[in-house]
Amino acid sequence: MDLVVLMQNARLQLKPFWPLSVAVCLVYGILIGVPSELNTYGELLSILLAGPLQLGLCIYFLKICNGINPSLSNLFEGFKPLLNVLLAFIIINALTLLGLFFLLVPGIIISLGFSMTYYIIAEHPEMQFNEALECSWKMMDGHKRELFSLHLRFLPWYLIGLLFFVIGVFLVIPWHNLSIASYYQAIKKNNINDR
């Protein structure tokens, strides 16, 4: 897959939605970041919000991929299959931390292997979290290095964004997210049977 073309197409798709996408990512960041700074209960609240909001972010960017006008409310659609999403979030993060405990590379591999879980749940909300995890792992078989490379391609853009007093980073985050959603769309065709 040509990652440069994927990134260019994502940037073109994002153009009419860039201000809204920046706002969605900003709201996501505030809802995840602010409670954890308050106190111990705030950290717990952040953990409880992280999975559903991550799913909402995936729903938002998948809408753009599918040519559907997104809205800020998409960010909160991840709360509908709440238990399913929370269990997926806990398992993904526990396994990633376990992998990172042993070495950096296993943690990265585990994270990449489960990286499509939220997209799968977004498109198949009836799917149980363990099925979505398994499906993501199978889907990413042979694609982890390519996805890692896609993430690395955004590193210079984030660094350039930092040069512009961090404001530029807020322009890169939606582009990065849409590129990952587009990557999911590209690889899912061979891996998920439509239900």
PLM-predicted stretches and their roles:
Residues M1-L31, N69-L98, I110-L162, I192-R195:
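Interfacial aromatic "cap" segments that immediately flank transmembrane helices
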Residues L38-N69, L97-F129, Y158-N193:
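Selective recognition of hydrophobic, aromatic-rich stretches within alpha-helical transmembrane segments
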